[in-house]
Amino acid sequence: MLDREGFRPNVGIILINARNEVFWGKRIGEHSWQFPQGGIKYGETPEQAMFRELHEEVGLLPEHVRIVGRTRDWLRYEVPDKFIRREIRGHYRGQKQIWFLLRMVGRDCDIQLRATEHPEFDAWRWSQYWVPLEAVIEFKREVYQLALSELSRFVQRQTRAPLSPYGRGGQHRERDGRDARDSRERSSDQGGRNEQHAQPALTVTTTTVIVETVSVSAPTPSSPNPDDTAPKDNS
């Protein structure tokens, strides 16, 4: 389902834990990480689509989360032609998204990446709030910047502490490289339990943070797809 401009209605999900770290999922069979997201089906509201995608991709139910906020307007990104299937080029341009900020009130063991027969992720971890800005694929970066920035005010309102993307001296932190090198992966058939960190993540500093990555076994697709470029409902 595309709008008149060729954008597919979509929802994005920023899930935070008690330390204001964000859920970060590794796309199945690939080396790319992203937030949960997916298309809005005909007749669905954005909120209904969000809860459906949350269960399909992360295995969580409405009682496991609390809605903290959402973006006021649609945020759009265009997908490069090389990532678009040939038969829909010229019609499909990209995604327009409503982003939701959710607070995790359940436990880490409630996260189940294989809740459906077609999992989206095969590993996950908690990352500092601003890390995804530099870790996500480039053509999504501006939308991530807009969504994280707009929704950060809800996090600050609850914690009464600034949530800045800058470290000491105003220098932007070299986030993704260090976090990726310092992450430790462990396997689990059902998503396992992502052990808690001792460090708070209210601000991004120059301190290297060690994060846990939880992996699950899942079949590798025959051809990796770097983005939700096809007009499918379970992306």
Swiss-Prot record:
Pfam families: NUDIX (PF00293). PROSITE patterns: NUDIX (PS51462), NUDIX_BOX (PS00893). Residues 171-196 have a biased composition (Basic and acidic residues). Its cofactor is a divalent metal cation. Residues 6-149 form the Nudix hydrolase domain. Its EC number is 3.6.1.-. Residues 203-220 have a biased composition (Low complexity). Transmembrane segments: none annotated. Gene3D superfamilies: Nucleoside Triphosphate Pyrophosphohydrolase (3.90.79.10). It comes from the Bacteria. Accelerates the degradation of transcripts by removing pyrophosphate from the 5'-end of triphosphorylated RNA, leading to a more labile monophosphorylated state that can stimulate subsequent ribonuclease cleavage. This is RNA pyrophosphohydrolase.
